[in-house]
Amino acid sequence: MSNNETMMFNVEKEKVNEARELLVSVYKALKEKGYNPINQIVGYILSGDPTYITNHLDARSSIRKVERDELLEEILRCYLEECIGKEGSV
């Protein structure tokens, strides 16, 4: 594939729902333990180090069941859909 062609990246719908549910549960677990959930999740996504995620409510083992690129895709999807919903376009 040359640099002039656009590669396609797709995640199955089922995995999108799984990623969304997982992010919500991990967010809640981190919040309950007094952590800044955004900072901790970003640390995990950037580094791949699961110790950024608490063991509380089995969040650490759960987050490892979904690939980090799938988590990032879901975060980006939710963010952009929210922006589009408010402004009509990105």
Curated annotation (Swiss-Prot):
Coiled coil spans: none
InterPro entries: IreB
Superkingdom of origin: Bacteria
Family: Belongs to the UPF0297 family.
Protein name: UPF0297 protein Cthe_0151
Record organism: Acetivibrio thermocellus (strain ATCC 27405 / DSM 1237 / JCM 9322 / NBRC 103400 / NCIMB 10682 / NRRL B-4536 / VPI 7372)
Lineage, opening ranks: Bacteria, Bacillati, Bacillota, Clostridia, Eubacteriales
